[in-house]
Regions:
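Aromatic-rich juxtamembrane segments at the membrane interface
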Residues: 155-285, 292-293, 422, 568, ...
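Core dinuclear metal-dependent hydrolase active-site scaffold
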Residues: 315-316, 320-322, 440-548, 552, ...
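Cap/insert and terminal regions of metallo-dependent hydrolase folds
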Residues: 643-718
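Transmembrane helix-bundle segments that form internal channels/tunnels in multi-pass membrane proteins
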Residues: 1-74, 78-82, 243-255, 259, ...
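Membrane-interface helix/helix-cap signal primarily in integral membrane proteins
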Residues: 54-223, 533, 537-541, 545-549, ...
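Metallo-beta-lactamase
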Residues: 550-561, 659-663
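Active-site HxH/HxHxD metal-binding segment of metal-dependent hydrolases
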Residues: 554, 558-593
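Membrane-interface helix caps and helix-loop-helix hairpins in membrane proteins
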Residues: 20-22, 272-281, 296-300, 317-327, ...
Length: 754
């Protein structure tokens, strides 16, 4: 079987890891292996391809099982382990590899993210520690269109997180890279663009100012700060050119292309080590190694064959790389450029220098911009209208000037003359100053798009193929039909009688969206934390991705886990009204007796009492929403005292189809009397898996279930959406119904709360 065919089998074999709901067990894998071995004995390329694909599927699934093994066997108790740090902020966040557990070596080492202080020695990469750890499986919030942190953690081979109970340094020496980085950081203290230079040279992006990150995102140049194929291939090219130049002063028998090629690969590996050996850098090195091997084979390979072999080798070496978004961005970027230059090449010999170079750069950037639209929209929910102009400026400056200057300065920093190093750093700093001066002159070009644009984003691919085949001449009806299908989401409208309530997965907090006819209301805005809030990170992207216009906010009470995202949301939709029991300026009242209508839905406030301005859980704004057939009771954080007072005054109005479980399922709420009076069919609870109060309480869960409620909670189900219509209501949970994936499961013990 030819190598590209084998690579194609590997790619096909690993793709099921993207959508398998559960991983096949040992008996299924044994059966697949036996079938593959039986097929190998038969003749024919197709049969051999099926057999190899089956064997590689088994390999991929076994790799996934191995990645999940620590979540089943290393959690649930305090463990003592030896950990080698690979990354640290020097304070309370550390990433590393567990190499020994209770005296036994772990192979392969288990990646872990740790929280806590390491004393008395200052933490740095490369240190060897003996730690007492409280380990737990990775668990992430899951919202439609949001960042998938569980998938990301598994792609990075870090299935565990934990707290440091105790630690002692077995070897406090920092790694050679960490010592070099410290020396380099001290050397660059006087340069204004030192953070960007460290990012480009060493892959250190933690110190980048937020303003620079936002600017690069808005101009579509963030990819330049990632140590990816572009930087590592550039480092390899510099080594190759350097060695090629040296060869010209050597005897003729020493001149050849093989030695520079191998030296370039060695230089790429060395640079990847210098940048921390992150997974994208390792994948790039493997791809370069495959390219070198194909070149050394003496055969002719097409661009598509090289692409297949590189991607196939990466996925065989690391099957979980199939979960990595950065891998698919890189793979599709290369595939898109191959497609672009083959299907829409520039006419040869039409322009002279310098116009030939300028037009070639524009042609290249146009291909990247247009053909990556589907992935960019799917991953980032928007496009940069200024990315073309920004990259035409940034790519030459960074790749041809800044990065070579930085790499040369890093080499000179080891032993070269100080004056030469200073001149190199100064030149790189001035190049970056020119770059960001130009980027700041561009208008804010970031355009947020919603899910309706996903299908139409593949139009550039279809237009190139249609232009090449002249389809618009031969099959105009087919072209119009395809265009109609791509634009169909823009004309599709939900049923007029349908409305939805979505409980977003915001961790230990509450944020619910009521939507109808393309409009939305919020009940609470989730928690906030020192670096951000749920409004900025979850609610605003979710509303925009679903093409919803926010018209109002109901705020249950003043606690930060319920109002944390309020300021961010109001900044995005300043015209939205706010209703709360707090009596704050510009807030409409939310007290018992208040009634209003919105989009044909009836809203009735049941608590707190009129005129009350007290604060706290027991003064949460309780609202009942109904459409005349079905209803939902939103309770905030009320506890038993408020429940009993509300029932004694307003018990006739509490009956509802569904209830938002009060106070995240705390044992101080959801009294038996309230559960009985509401008499609902389902209960929805919002909490985080690892909250300090172990909510929802096991007793509360059982209380609802014994009364016939169906129980739904964001730790288990992720985002929960209730669809109301004339036919009744349905609940769709993201983790186990809409996107049931093996990497979305609840890893570890069956329950951690209660």
């Amino acid at each position: 079987m030819r190598l590209p065919w084998l690579a194609g089998c590997a790619i096909i074999a690993m793709l099921p890891l993207l959508w398998l709901p559960v991983l096949p067990g040992p008996y299924s894998l044994a059966g697949a292996s036996a079938l593959a071995l039986a097929l190998i004995r038969l003749h024919g390329r197709a049969v051999a391809g099926v057999a190899m694909t089956l064997l590689l599927v088994v390999w991929g699934v076994l790799s996934a099982h191995q990645a999940l093994w620590p979540t089943r066997h290393l959690t649930g108790a305090i463990r003592q382990a030896e950990v080698i740090l690979s990354e640290t902020d020097g304070q309370t966040l550390h990433r590393g590899q567990m190499v020994r557990l209770r005296g036994r070596y772990l192979f392969p080492p288990v990646g872990v993210t740790l929280y806590g202080e390491l004393a008395p020695a200052p933490a740095c990469a490369g240190q060897h520690w003996l730690m007492t750890l409280r380990l737990r499986p990775v668990h992430g919030q899951l919202n439609d269109g949001g960042f998938d942190s569980q998938r990301y953690a598994l792609a990075q081979h870090r299935p565990l997180s934990g707290g440091i109970v105790a630690a002692s340094a077995l070897d406090a020496r920092c790694s050679l890279r960490a010592r070099y980085l410290t020396s380099l950081t001290r050397r660059l203290q006087t340069y204004p663009w030192r953070a960007v230079m460290l990012g480009l040279g060493m892959g250190e992006r933690l110190s980048l100012p937020t303003e620079i990150k936002v600017l690069m995102q808005n101009t579509g140049t963030s990819h330049l700060m990632a140590i990816s194929g572009l930087h590592i291939a550039l480092a390899a090219s510099l080594i190759m050119l350097l060695l090629r130049g040296v060869q010209y002063i050597l005897p003729g028998r020493w001149i050849g292309w093989r030695l520079p090629l191998v030296a370039g690969l060695a230089g790429a590996v060395g640079y990847a080590w210098l940048t921390g050996m992150q997974p994208p850098a390792l994948r790039t090195c493997l791809g370069l190694a495959v390219c070198c091997a194909l070149r050394l084979s003496g055969q002719r390979w097409t661009a598509w064959q090289v692409w297949l072999c590189c991607l196939g080798a990466i996925l065989v070496a690391d099957p979980l790389a199939v979960l990595s978004q950065s891998l698919w961005l890189s793979a599709f970027a290369v595939a898109g450029l191959i497609f672009w230059f083959q299907w829409l090449p520039l006419p040869a010999g039409r322009w002279r220098w310098p116009w030939k170079t300028i037009i070639a750069l524009v042609h290249l950037q146009a291909g990247v911009t247009l053909l990556l639209l589907p992935l960019q929209l799917l991953l980032f929910h928007g496009v940069s209208l200024t990315s073309m102009a920004a990259n035409l400026l940034a790519v030459p400056l960074v790749t041809l000037l800044a990065v070579p200057l930085i790499l040369t300065a890093m080499l000179v920093h080891l032993s070269g003359p100080d004056i030469v190093e200073s001149l190199l750093w100064l030149a790189a700093d001035r190049v970056l100053a020119l770059l960001f001066w130009g980027l700041r002159r561009l208008p804010d070009g970031w355009l947020t798009l919603d899910a309706r644009w996903l299908w139409i984003s593949i139009l550039p691919w279809l237009l190139v193929m249609g232009w090449r085949f002249q389809s618009w001449r031969h099959s105009p009806a087919l072209c119009l039909s395809v265009l109609f299908l791509l634009t169909r989401p823009f004309s599709r409208q939900p049923p007029a009688d349908e409305w939805r309530v979505t409980m977003l997965d915001v961790g230990q907090g509450l944020a619910m969206v009521i939507e109808r006819h393309g409009k939305a209301l919020l009940y609470d805005t989730g928690p906030a934390w020192p670096q951000g809030d749920s409004g900025q990170q979850v609610i605003i992207p979710w509303l925009r991705w679903h093409h919803l216009q926010l018209q109002g906010i109901m705020l249950s009470h003043e606690h930060l886990d319920h109002r944390g995202g309020l300021d961010s949301v109001l900044q995005a939709w300043p015209q939205a009204w706010v209703r709360s029991p707090l009596g704050w300026a510009h807030h409409l009242p939310c007290h018992r007796g208040e009634r209003w209508q919105w989009q044909g839905l009836n809203f009735q406030a049941l608590w707190p009492l009129p005129g009350s301005t007290a604060k706290g859980n027991n003064h949460s704004c309780v609202v009942r929403i109904d459409d005349g057939r079905s209803s939902i009771l939103l309770t905030g954080d009320i506890e038993r005292q408020a429940e009993q007072a509300m029932i004694s005054r307003y018990w006739r109005h509490l009956t509802s189809t569904l209830i938002q479980v009060p106070h995240h399922g705390s044992n101080t709420s959801s009294s038996a009397l309230l559960v009985r009076r509401v008499d609902g069919a389902a209960a929805l609870a919002s909490a985080s898996r690892y909250n300090a109060w172990r909510m929802p309480s096991y007793k509360v869960v059982q209380r609802y279930r014994l009364r016939g409620y169906r129980w739904f909670a964001t730790p288990q189900q992720g985002q929960i959406t209730v669809v109301f219509s004339a036919e009744g209501w349905q609940i769709h949970s993201l983790r186990d119904q809409v996107l049931p994936r093996w990497y979305h499961q609840w890893f570890g013990a069956p329950a951690d709360n209660g």
